[in-house]
Amino acid sequence: MSKLFWAMLAFISRLPVPSRWSQGLDFEQYSRGIVMFPFIGLILGGVSGLIFILLQPWCGIPLAALFCILALALLTGGFHLDGLADTCDGIFSARRRERMLEIMRDSRLGTHGGLALIFVLLAKILVVSELALRGTPMLAALAAACAAGRGSAVLLMYRHRYAREEGLGNVFIGKVSGRQTCITLGLAIIIATVLLPGMQGLAAMVVTCAAIFILGQLLKRTLGGQTGDTLGAAIELGELIFLLALL
């Protein structure tokens, strides 16, 4: 299990993980690592939250929010943001399904992808700033949001098909069991409710799961399935929706 955790941490983040810590683990086994996603989100969000706390007394809330969101993007290597941009470029091209998938494979950034990145990053910075002004504990909020975003992404894996013949997302999409889905969502809910007081964390998690489930159904109808890009989009939007639900 520890090998699986380190493999997942290296897979969806840019944190340095020695290769020997996950040595001997086959790529086909990665689907079992979905239950680790909320914990990885907890770590990434915790680092981002610490950066906010350290910088806020020095440069104020707006700049601290900017740098903590920038840190979060750097910690993931922009992996999920790239998926968000590619998904929006494809979906909003208003082409046939096959052409949408081709556009999503294109490494060049299109207008819709650029607008999506600007909107999501700016929205995160503004929401984090507003939450801090309202006295929300930002370490807890960011850690819970990142756990929720990664945990809710399982809703685009369970009982979904892969829209392409090959790709990284094929490791998870359609390969996750109902038990793994329940465990992943359960862990994300526990993290959110423990970190945030009262029913705030639970309510935000319910809103996030509902929104990501609807997103998954819309993407399934449009693309005929999911891809690694749509998983990245779900994670980014899940984080934002969770933070918005805390307002």
UniProtKB/Swiss-Prot annotation:
It is found in: Cell inner membrane. Its EC number is 2.7.8.26. Its cofactor is Mg(2+). GO terms for cellular component: plasma membrane. It catalyses: alpha-ribazole + adenosylcob(III)inamide-GDP = adenosylcob(III)alamin + GMP + H(+); alpha-ribazole 5'-phosphate + adenosylcob(III)inamide-GDP = adenosylcob(III)alamin 5'-phosphate + GMP + H(+). GO terms for biological process: cobalamin biosynthetic process. It is an enzyme of class 2 (transferase). It is a multi-pass membrane protein. Pathway: Cofactor biosynthesis; adenosylcobalamin biosynthesis; adenosylcobalamin from cob(II)yrinate a,c-diamide: step 7/7. Pfam families: CobS (PF02654). Keywords: Cell inner membrane, Cell membrane, Cobalamin biosynthesis, Magnesium, Membrane, Transferase, Transmembrane, Transmembrane helix. The chain crosses the membrane at residues 34-54, 59-79, 113-133, 138-158, 171-193, 197-219. InterPro entries: CobS. GO terms for molecular function: adenosylcobinamide-GDP ribazoletransferase activity; cobalamin 5'-phosphate synthase activity. Belongs to the CobS family. Joins adenosylcobinamide-GDP and alpha-ribazole to generate adenosylcobalamin (Ado-cobalamin). Also synthesizes adenosylcobalamin 5'-phosphate from adenosylcobinamide-GDP and alpha-ribazole 5'-phosphate. PANTHER family: ADENOSYLCOBINAMIDE-GDP RIBAZOLETRANSFERASE (PTHR34148:SF1). This is Adenosylcobinamide-GDP ribazoletransferase. The gene is cobS.
